[in-house]
């Protein structure tokens, strides 16, 4: 897929490829006091299932998950999703982290995790690579305030671009086809 795109952004824009060449990588280290705080959150969570890696280091940030990032099955993920909806566990952990570490971006991401990075290093950082004349379209599933797609959706909108809330890759594909068809019609009408 990388070779079919001009540029690919991973890890909230902290890991960037042009073709197969890595052109930018932000190597950020999780501070020890933050790691200890995450370990305590894990220790005191009342959710009973634990699997795999709970603190996943990525370029430019960390993903934290009470359930774990590897070796989890669909049923376990669904159990955590239900638990989180009932208890707002991720929201509460994020709130505590933001209070204790105001120099961190803490955002709810995906179904089971929290994304942590230095303040200002959220997904909106990718806009540094675009011109004001570029037509921007962003697709995301977590666009509410405090979620990991919010900052980019807001920044794209402020630049006159478009953002689309999607449920999954199939929904993304459907919306992409719709945009493609609309652009084709507009070019024929002109």
Predicted regions and their residues:
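Terminal peptide-recognition signature
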Residues: 8, 64, 149
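Residues at the C-termini of beta-strands that transition into short coil/loop
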Residues: 9-12, 110, 167-170
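Short glycine-/acidic-enriched loop or helix-start segments at secondary-structure transitions
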Residues: 20, 74, 148-150
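Hydrophobic, Leu/Ile/Phe/Ala-enriched alpha-helical segments that form helix-helix packing faces
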Residues: 37-46, 89, 93-101, 156, ...
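Mg2+-dependent phosphoryl-transfer enzymes with acidic/Ser/Thr/Gly-rich catalytic loops
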Residues: 117-119, 123-190
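Active-site phosphate-binding/coordination module
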Residues: 1-54
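Conserved acidic, metal-coordinating active-site core of Asp-based
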Residues: 49-137, 145
